[in-house]
Structure formats: C-alpha cells, structure tokens
Design a protein with these regions (language model features):
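Short coil turns that delineate tetratricopeptide repeat
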Residues: 40, 73-74, 107, 141-142, ...
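Helix-start (N-cap) detector for alpha-helical repeat units in TPR-like alpha-solenoids
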Residues: 43, 76-77, 110-111, 144-145, ...
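Juxtacatalytic substrate-recognition/specificity segment
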Residues: 104, 131, 139, 204, ...
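Canonical tetratricopeptide repeat
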Residues: 81, 115, 150, 185-188, ...
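Beta/coil-rich, acidic/histidine-enriched accessory regions frequently appended to metallopeptidases
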Residues: 34-37, 45, 51, 55, ...
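Structural signature of tandem alpha-helical TPR/SEL1-like repeats
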Residues: 57-61, 89-98, 124-132, 159-170, ...
Length: 906
C-alpha cells in the first residue's frame, strides 16, 4: 500500500514555486531563456480565455482563441489547448496536425508528445503511441507524471502489464516523494493507483485532485468511472452531474451518465458534442444489440471501429454477438484482430463473458471468464463475472470462491460485496429437498410455506414434463428470500430490482417470500417453473419476449383463475398504436420507461403466444421452442414453423388483435388512467375509480360520468365509477344497475375494485348475504390475489357443511397468504371434519408457529391432532410443553392420559 501524503492546500501552494523550479533544473527538458518582454500579456489573456471556453464547452470558440496565440513562449500551451478543443469535437486529424511537431523531438515537447500519444490511442494506433511515449520516458530524467501513466496504460492495452506496473509505480513514487502538486497530475497518480489495484488510494487521490481544482472535469469523470466500475452508481452519478454542471457538453461525463440513467438521451447529447466519441458510439451499439436492434447496433459499432480499430469494448461486443450466434469463424477473426495489438486480452474475454451472462448464456459466460483469468489472474472483474455466473448455474461453492477472491483484492466492488453477503444470509436458511428440487428458505418459511410449496412443485413438475416432453436438469435450485434486497442482490447483484418478484436463470430460481407479497405465490412459482423448462429446452437461447410470453400464457393453463386479463390495456394500446411488431418484442422489455410499460410488454408477449396457441396449436408453439435451441435467424424459425415470413405472421397477429378488440367491444376514454400494480401482473392492479371517488365531489363526479355513459353506453370505467358513487350515496338500486352493466361489459376484469367486488359490498350493506357471497364467488373466478373473499366463502361453506367448497376456498386463500393464523384454524377444522388426520396435524403445526397469543391452546390442539394421527409420542411431548405453562389445564391432562395409555398397556 502506497503512503498518501495528503498535505494541506496552503502548504502545497507555498511549496509549488520552489519545487517547480527544482523540477525544471532536474529535467532534461529546459525552456530557452526568455526576456521579460517575452511574457506577452495578451497571449496570457488568450490562453486564459481559451481555457475558460474549453471548460464551459464552447469548443469552436476555444479553437478560434487558441489559434490567435502567436507567442513562441506560450506555443506549447496554446497547442495543448487547441488540440484538446479539436479532440473534444472529434476533429482528430486537426488535433494531430497541431501536435505533429512533437513527433519529431518528443523529449523536447513531452506534454505535446503525451497528448499526441493519447490521440494515437483514441484512433487505434497504440503501437505508435507506445513508441512515442517510450521516446519521452527515455529522453527525460523526470518525465511528466501524465507521460508515465499514459505509457503504463498503453503497455497495459498492449498486454505488457508487468512493464506497465513499473511506470504506474514510478508515478506513485513521484507523489510519495512530494513532487506532485497540480490537480491534473494528482488525478493521473490516482489512475496509476487504480491500475495497481490500490483502490482506496485511488479514491483518496481523486478526492485530492478535485479538492485542488473543482473544475478538473477529467478528474471528476475518472473518479466517477472508478465508482461505476465498483457498481457504486450513486456516487458516480454525483460526479458526472458535477462535471455537467460546469460543462453540459462534456462527452465523457454524458457517456458515464448514460450507463446509469436515460441512456439514449445522454448518448445522443454526447454525440451532439462529439459525433466521433468512440465510447458513446460503442455504448450505443452495445445497447442496441442487447435490445435486439442488431442493424442499428452494428452501425454504431462500425462507426466506433472506423475511428478506433483497437476499441476492445466494441470488438468484444461483436465477438460476444458472434459467440451467441455460434459463428465461431467470425469470433476467431475478431479475436485475431485483438491479438494483433493486445495478445489474449483479459479485458476482451471478461467483456465477452459479461455480455453473455447478461444475455442468460451462463455456461458460455463461465468459459470466457475463465479464459480472462487464465490470461490475467489479477483481473478481479473477471473473477466477479465468473463467480456470479457460476452461482446462476447452481455451482455455488466455486462461485463463492471466485467472489471471495475478487473481494479480498477489490473490497470496494459493491456487486461482489453484495453477492457475498447473500451467502451469509443463505447460511442461516434451511435447505429442503424433494425429488426434483433443492430449496433454500428461511427457518420460518420452512415451517409455514414448505409444506404447501413442496406438493405444488412436484405436481407442477409432473404436469410440465408431460406437456413439454422434456425433463430439466435436477435438482432445480429454488431460493426464497425474506428480504426483497437479498432477493435482488442474489438475482442481479444490486439491491434495487424494481417490482420483480421472481427470476429464473434456467437451473436456478430466485423468489421473494410470499410473506412480503400481496400476490398469489403459487402462480408465481408456476410461472418461474415454466421458465425452467423453456430456458433449458433452448439452452437459454430463447428471447425474453417468448420466454415471458409462454410463462404468462401458462399461468391461465395452470389454474383457471390465474393469468392476466388486461382488456382495457389492450384497447388503449391499439388506440395509441403501441403494439410492437413481433420481431421487435424484446424492445418492449429493454425500452420500458415505467412499470406500466414493462407490464404491457409481458401482456403483449402473452398475446402473441396465445395467438400461436389458438391459430396454430400447441404443437407449433412447441416446435417454435425447439427452433430456438438452434442458431438461426428468427425469420427463418417462423418460416420453418408457421410457413410464413415475419411480416405475414405479424399481419395475422394484428388482424387477430383487431378482432379481439372488437369482441371486447368496450369504450375506453382517453382521460382514464391504466390500472397500476406491482409485480408485473403478479398482484392486485388498482383502478383509479376508487381514488376518484375519494378526491372529487360525489355530485359533480356523478354528473360527469352520467354524461359519459349517455354519450358512450359501453364506457366500462364510467359505469364502474357511477356504481361506486351511487353506492356511497346509498342509492343501491341504481348502483347495482351500473355495476351489473360494467360486469356484463367486461366480465373477466381483474382490477381493484372490480364490479363484482363493489356489488358484493352493496349487497352486504343491504343485508343480502347470499347475493354478497354470489358476487364474491364471481369475482374469484378471475381474481387470484384476494385473501378476504375466499376466507369468507370458506367459513360459510364450512358452516353449512359444503366441505368440498370449503376445501376449494381454503386452498385459494393459502395461495395468497399462508401466514395468517385464521386460514390454518379453518383448514384444521376442515381437515378434521374430512377425517384427514395428517392434514389436521399439518395445519396445527403451522398454526403453532404462527399463533403466539395462546401457545397453550395451540400445543394442546396439536397434541390432539398427533393423537388422532397415531403419533402418541409426539402428542405426549407436545402436551407436556403445554402443561409446563398451564399445569392445571384439564383438556391437556386428558390428552396426556390418552397419549400414555398405549405404552402402559404394553
């Protein structure tokens, strides 16, 4: 660890002149003696003005000002400023012309030569850059700090890390020796520290550089890049924004910010400032390819490589794309292209691995991450990529080893740290196994959830194996997290994952515990299990739209009440022309700007799958799945299965949608808001009608909605709103009329509140319990996320002796919330009346975990259940625990006597 001498600013300023003079004496480069008259005030003013214009992003004006400096004494400074102004606008040839004289005698003009070398690197001439910097270093006793660091970066790029480290260490030694004072040089020392894996030092040095000069845009952005490299987006964003407050056209800051927020807007701004900014072009290209917009992405990458043929990120993106398509000839061509200037580049392989992992190609990602580590065992990013992808393949032990190795050497990487912390969480979890599954969940969930999840998993397995004719690799690993943050970190490495509630990686599934949800957890499990099948069937090659579309379509196949019914959203999307072409469906996921957009992407994908199932049949859907197991163009796959090209298929889908909208035949007002909910359909979606009723005067709202239904009798939302308003006014007859009309218009509506739910409330207010229960039952035909309604119906069915009905509604309630004691009391009573002693035991065991209000009664009930199920030893031990607390409890004493009688009789 290098010593950091954070000398106070005042001391630094006091020492600057003396040390600078000493440095000049030591340097092999000395300025010619100039007479006092040579200090041309007008030239200095021009330099200051040019610097100010550069700082504020007025690059063309800066070019004009710097071009007016004609004093030889300031020539190097003017050319540095002029070249930078040209470079900031992508005028690399003009910048090179300005700097060209440094190429002849680089040691005499070290700053110019260093800037020229940086330009060579930007334009894909690292060999020339290496030679130029070598000449400066060899020709100078004390070459500039920037020269040392840039030389190290070039040597690193060209694969000579050991030689690079020599120059990075020289830069740090210069700082430790008290010979670095300027903000720009301190920032370069920070870069050297970062390259030497001294991340704490790098952070402190960047901080010092910015403290010395708050306008050092380069330092602000390089510091932000360090944060972003460690997945600390919050601090990175702060740095980029600080730079942009000074210069809103500073392209490096815009590119950095684009990786965090508003990517297309910020990248477009960067390219407006510099249309030849390779980082912006490469980032845009990678984003487009990741979103399935290959032609656009390839165009950006070609532009980047035309400017810098040695851009490893651009070449790695193209190579990763080739690997995903199994085009190994193209991959090898790209690899050899990289090898020509950076033999077996570790960063090249690590970038490929990261790209593949982000596209769910975990097996291939592991392969390339290993190659990166073989080339450079110090590439801690590659260790993190390898560890994360191994975990997603279920290879947790080896994955953890690589994550630990990365963390030990780079403890500031938030992603690595987060993933390791989840291992600590999992160590406290129970590990449960069934025939085909290995499940990690909290001790609480192991007692409450597992008894209901295990049979669901195995039953679902049998059904899906029979349906798809495929058996996934076992065991399938399922991890159920109590904390949303742990679920997010295990899934993507960072604690913010939005409203997702489950993720499948093919062999591993992560879920949020139902204890933190208000949704049907069984539907979620089924949805994710379908992913296990389709992803493994296609070796994780299936696009997201089809994978999500099939899983969403299968929801309704799993249970009649499951699935998404978004008729209003469909009509609204058609009205707004929001339906994407089938070939661009992945854009709906990657380009979503809100949860509502993402929810609709799921819904449209489901509609395409439903169209296939209805128009072509399940066998053709299965054939399409198998097509994705091979590497073909998507249009060829569709032609093979459906006998039509993508355009014809899309036209057929749109005609089907138009007919579906016509069949729904409901008016949707432009002012109505779409239903909103969390979990991308896995949960209640709230209708704005209830909110409107709270916000607005009943009479004015009623008159407005009456006007709407008079103009458009099939205005579902207006009828529903009128029903709510009239119910609040206790005008029950009129409320019922409008609510029944709303239900008839859209009988499968699942938003909250639905017409049937409000009708149930109306009948409850009228004292008509039978009609109330009838409406609750109607609501539950299409609403899988409600707990109160099935509970009420189960209690009534139990009271009147309709045990099958009671059992159905008990299961419906358990599917939403197995953590409420009352459902287990009803379940225990039901099981007892059905003579199912084993189920009675289960319900009382769970109830004992949940109900801490009266543990004596809970243990006594459980003891009786054990006794009835021929488990006298368990009954005796349980009732003794009850008697420890209440030794005179007569019922417990009687159960104890019954429990010990058989053993005494023996």
């Amino acid at each position: 660890m290098h010593c950091l001498k954070l000398t106070t600013l005042n001391c630094l300023r006091a020492a600057t002149l003396l040390v600078a003079m000493a440095a000049l004496l030591l340097s092999g480069h000395t300025f010619a003696q100039q007479p006092t008259a040579g200090l041309n005030p007008s030239a200095q003013e021009l330099l200051d003005r040019g610097q100010e214009l550069l700082l504020r992003g007025s690059y063309l004006a800066a070019v004009e000002v710097y071009s007016r400096v004609d004093d030889d004494f300031f020539r190097d400074q003017a050319q540095l400023g002029l070249s930078r102004a040209h470079m900031e606008t992508g005028q690399y040839a003009q910048a090179e012309a300005v700097l060209q004289r440094a190429a002849e005698e680089p040691a005499d003009h070290p700053e110019l030569a260093t800037r020229l070398a940086e330009l060579y690197v930007k334009t894909g001439r690292s060999g020339q850059a290496e030679a130029l910097l070598a000449a400066v270093v060899d020709g100078q006793l004390n070459p500039p700090v920037r020269t040392l660091v840039q030389y190290g970066l070039v040597l690193t790029l060209r694969g000579d890390r050991d030689a690079a480290d020599v120059h990075f260490n020289a830069a740090l030694a210069r700082y430790d020796g008290g010979m670095v004072f300027e903000s720009a040089d301190v920032a370069m020392v920070a870069v050297a520290a970062r390259q030497l894996d001294e991340f704490h030092d790098a952070n402190a040095l960047f901080s010092e550089a910015v403290r010395l000069d708050g306008n050092n845009l380069e330092a602000l952005v390089l510091w932000g890049d360090l944060f972003q490299d460690k997945f600390n987006d919050q601090d990175a964003q702060t740095n980029y924004n600080e730079a942009l407050e000074i210069n809103r056209r500073y392209a490096p800051a815009l590119v950095g910010l684009a990786r965090i927020e508003s990517p297309e807007r910020n990248l477009s701004r960067a390219l407006d400032a510099n249309a030849r900014n390779v980082a912006a072009l490469q980032t845009f290209g990678e984003r487009m390819i990741r979103n399935g917009r290959d032609e656009e992405g390839l165009g950006f990458l070609r532009q980047a490589l035309d400017i810098n043929p040695e851009s490893i990120p651009a070449l790695a993106t193209l190579a990763a794309r080739a690997a995903m398509k199994d085009d190994m000839d193209e991959f090898e061509r790209l690899r050899q292209r990289v090898n020509a200037f950076s033999p077996e580049s570790a960063s090249f392989y690590a970038s490929i691995a990261e790209f593949l992992g982000n596209n769910y190609r975990f097996t291939e990602a592991v392969e390339y991450a290993r190659r990166a580590i073989d080339r450079d065992p110090r590439n801690w990013h590659a260790h993190t990529v390898l560890g994360g992808n191994l975990v997603r393949l279920g290879e947790e032990r080896e994955g953890k080893q690589h994550l630990e190795q990365a963390f030990d050497n780079d403890p500031f990487n938030v992603l690595t740290s987060n993933m390791l912390q989840v291992f600590d969480v999992l160590e406290e979890y129970a590990t449960l196994e069934s025939e085909h599954f290995r499940v990690n969940m909290s001790q609480r969930d192991a007692q409450i959830l597992w008894p209901y999840m295990e049979p669901l998993l195995e039953d679902s397995w049998d059904r899906l194996v029979a349906k798809y004719g495929f058996e996934p690799e076992v065991p399938v690993v399922i991890q159920v997290f109590e904390r949303t943050e742990d679920f997010a970190v295990r899934s993507v490495g960072l604690p913010d994952i939005g409203p997702l509630v489950g993720i499948c990686f093919g062999k591993v599934v992560t879920l949020i515990s139902p204890d933190t949800l208000s949704a049907n957890w069984q539907e979620i499990v089924w949805h994710e299990l379908v992913h296990v099948f389709t992803l493994q069937m296609t070796h994780n090659r299936m696009p997201r739209w089809l994978s999500e579309g099939i899983s969403t379509w299968e929801e309704r196949q799993g249970r009649p009440e499951w699935g998404r019914r978004q008729g209003l959203d469909l009509i609204r999307a058609v009205q707004q022309d929001r339906l994407l072409p089938v070939g661009n469906l992945n854009d709906g996921f990657t380009g979503a700007n809100s949860d509502a957009d993402l929810s609709f992407a799921y819904f449209q994908s489901f509609l395409v799958v439903e169209y296939i199932a209805e128009q072509y049949g399940f066998e053709d859907l299965l054939a399409l799945i198998h097509e994705y197991a091979e590497i073909r163009d998507e249009s060829e796959m569709f032609a093979n299965v459906f006998g039509v090209d993508m355009a014809t298929f899309d036209a057929g889908f749109r005609a089907w949608i138009e007919q579906r909208v016509a069949d729904i035949n409901v008016y949707v007002h432009a002012e109505d808001s779409p239903d909103e909910g969390e979990g991308h359909g896995h949960g209640v979606r709230e209708n704005s009608s209830a909110i409107l009723a709270e916000l607005y005067n009943n009479e004015s709202l009623k008159q407005y909605m009456l006007g709407r239904v008079q103009r458009e009798p099939r205005d579902f939302q207006a009828h529903l709103q009128l029903g709510i308003v009239l119910f609040r006014e206790q005008a029950y007859t009129e409320a019922i009329r409008h609510l029944r009309t709303a239900h008839e218009l859209l009988p499968d509506y699942t938003g909250y509140p639905s017409p049937s739910l409000v009708l149930a409330q109306v009948y409850e207010a009228m004292g008509d319990e039978e009609a109330q229960r009838e409406q609750l039952a109607i609501m539950l035909e299409h609403q899988q996320h409600d707990f109160a309604a099935p509970m009420e119906l189960a209690e009534h069915a139990l009271q009147v002796g309709e045990l099958d009905q009671a059992a159905y509604y008990v299961e419906r309630a358990l599917a939403v919330n197995p953590y409420r004691p009352e459902i287990h009391r009803i379940g225990a009573e039901l099981a007892s009346r059905q003579g199912d002693t084993q189920r009675t035991v289960l319900e009382y065991e769970v109830l004992l975990t949940l109900d801490q209000n009266d543990p004596v009664a809970a243990r006594t009930d459980l003891a009786q259940a054990y006794l009835d199920n021929s488990q006298p030893d368990d009954a005796r031990m349980t009732v003794l625990r009850a008697l420890e607390t209440a030794p005179t409890y007569e019922r417990a004493q009687q159960i104890l006597l019954q429990a010990v009688e058989p053993s005494e009789g023996d």
